[in-house]
Amino acid sequence: VATQARALRPGIKISAAVFPDGGESREGIAQDWRYWVSEGLLDSVCPMNYTPDRARLELDVRRQLAWTGTKAQVVPGLGPSVCSEELTPERLLWMLDDVRRLGAAGFALFELDHALLEEYLPLLAAGRAAPAR
């Protein structure tokens, strides 16, 4: 698909939302994103790191960055809607700081719902989620 898309539209950027691990997803869900990155098929990956645990997030993002190296950008997906009771807006801000400190290209939030609109996004709009300068 990537080869055909690039032939039709040179310069197109191709990304994929992927499961966070690099091995089990290959065997269990036929999602070998580490291979796709190594072959230059993806420009960026968005691992679905839906955890309220900052230590787990840091471990996962460090591994994902190591797996991709300079071949693709890593844009970690965080899931305030998935872990809403444990992943408070304040905790999410700390996790965004962690992701930035680790060198990720950005972040994505799953999924747009009332809580994200009313509780999380106002804090992000206040400036904590602004790109690093």
Residue ranges and their predicted role:
Residues 32-33:
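Short, glycine/polar-rich helix-capping loops at beta-to-alpha or helix-loop-helix junctions
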Residues 1-5, 68, 99:
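Hydrophobic, Leu/Ile/Phe/Ala-enriched alpha-helical segments that form helix-helix packing faces
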Residues 1-29, 73-82:
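Aromatic-lined carbohydrate-recognition surfaces of secreted/lumenal glycan-active proteins
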Residues 4-8, 39, 48:
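Short hydrophobic alpha-helical module
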Residues 41-58, 64, 70-133:
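Substrate-binding cleft of secreted/luminal carbohydrate-active enzymes
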